Each structure stands twice: as C-alpha cells, then as structure tokens.
Amino acid sequence: DKVGKQARVLEDIGYDGLKSIETAHDPFMPLLVASQNTEKAELITGIAVAFARSPMIMANLGHDLNAAAKGRHVLGLGSQIRPHIQKRFSMPWSAPAARMREFILALRAIWANWYDDQPLEFLGKYYTHTLMTPFFAPTNNEYGAPKVHLAAVGPLMTEVAGEVADGLLVHGFTTEAYLRNVTLPALDRGLAHSGRTRADVEVSYPVFSIKGRDEKEIAAASKAMREQVAFYGSTPAYRPVLESIGVGEVQGELNALSKQGRWEAMGDVITADVLD
C-alpha cells in the first residue's frame, strides 16, 4: 500500500519515470504494485541483475510487468560484479560483456517467438533456447516486449549497450571526464556496429548529488555520499573512474578496508576534492 501511494504521489507531481533497484529486495514487485497505481510513468528496473537469472526467466518477468503496466515497463539490466554473481547468487561468471550481449539477443529471440511466431532456435555460447510449446507461451501480447536498457561502466559493456540495447544506464559513479572520454566514445562504437546513431538510444545519467535544507542536513548528506562513493570505489572494476580524476590510488586502500569490514572508515578516505 505504501509503494502504491508513493507511486501515485510521484506521478502526480510530475515524475515521468519510477525506478526500482535490486539490492535487499526484488526489483519487479514494487513496479508491479506501481503499475496498478499509475497511468503514465515509465516503470524501470534500475537495475535487475541479469546474470542472476536465465534469459527465459527474465523474458517472462519483462513480459508480465510490461503487460501489467500496459506498455510502460523498461527492463533495465546490469551484470553486477563477479563476487556477487558467484558467491551471492551461485551463478556462472565469464566474459561479462560477451555474455550480456548474448543474454539480450536471447531475450529478443524468445520475445520474437512469443509475439511474432518466429521459431525459437537460439544457439549461443552461453545460452541455448530451443524449446517452446503453446502451453508455456504467454498469450496476453497486446503490449509486446519492454524496452531493454543496459547499465554499463566499462567500455566493453558500454559498446554492448550501443549495439543491442534500447538505452544506456550510466552508473551514478561516473565522473564528467570518464563520461566524455570513455563512456560516450564506447557507446558510439557500439552504435556503429549496429548501424545506429545516438538518436536511436536513450541515455540515463542519475548523478550523485548532495542536498539539504541547512548545514546539518548538508553535513549528513556529505557523510553519506562519501560512504557511497567509497563503497563503489572499493571495486577494482571501477578504478578507471577514479583514475579519470587522478585519484586511482585510493581504490586499493578502499578495497583493503572493505575486506576488513571497515565500511564507515572507508568514507574518510574520500576527500572533498573527490566529491567535487
């Protein structure tokens, strides 16, 4: 009930998109509730962990939510990182960019079977889908497939977004320098692979921000932001983002603190210059 009320309020005050993340809870359930309490806002998973599920399961989830939302669902996917996929989800990890490309192509093949009566003959390196009988194929196909947006930080995954996705979800942990020098050129390379331009994709960039009504709130928000930046900065895959502003060396320090479980101490490593 709380989710439904909040969704209505956000739509009423002008938000045209509502996003649900996959952290402590499934990202689809809140959006299902929101779909029954809103009329216009896009409902976006931001993100759903692709490699924690098979393409068939994800195809079903995307279809069902898009049908419930009457065509307003955007299936935002992300890879997560190796430790979470292997140790938290107990799923295989390899060549994430290549695997994600195949994952999205598998989704397209499954949906083509459901919506366009195309034979399901997807034979890939990582995923194989060759069986679909009428009993298991959805029939409520009025709204078709959701748009697929892909979260990416590294250049290879960003190229995949440009090649096969409908949109790119830029990570909030992205500097202006990294966006201009790494992300957008990689997106353009991916678009070139598929003969598309930037006009053919949507790009979402949820920047980190610090705000408050007084100095006390600003101080609290700054502390929380330092801890959030430190959390992401501890991940080796995100070191190039820190290097883009000349502070790549702090990644090793943050990683060491994270392995010691010193999460709050990590925030002290992030200076005001880094936040700026």
Which residues does each PLM region occupy?
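Active-site mouth loops of central-metabolism enzymes
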Residues: 1, 48-55, 142-153, 209-213, ...
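N-terminal beta1-alpha1-beta2 module of alpha/beta enzyme domains
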Residues: 1-45, 51, 146
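Acidic-and-aromatic substrate-binding clefts and catalytic sites of carbohydrate-active enzymes
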Residues: 20-29, 51-56, 175-179, 210-212
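Glycine- and other small-residue-rich loops at beta-strand/loop junctions that grip anionic moieties
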Residues: 20-23, 47, 54, 96, ...
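Catalytic cores of alpha/beta
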Residues: 55-63, 212-222
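Internal, glycine-rich beta/alpha segment that forms the wall or movable "lid"
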Residues: 59-63, 67-167, 172-201, 252-254, ...
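Glycine-rich beta-alpha junction loops
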Residues: 81, 174, 205-213, 249
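Active-site pocket-lining/capping segments in soluble small-molecule metabolic enzymes
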Residues: 217-275
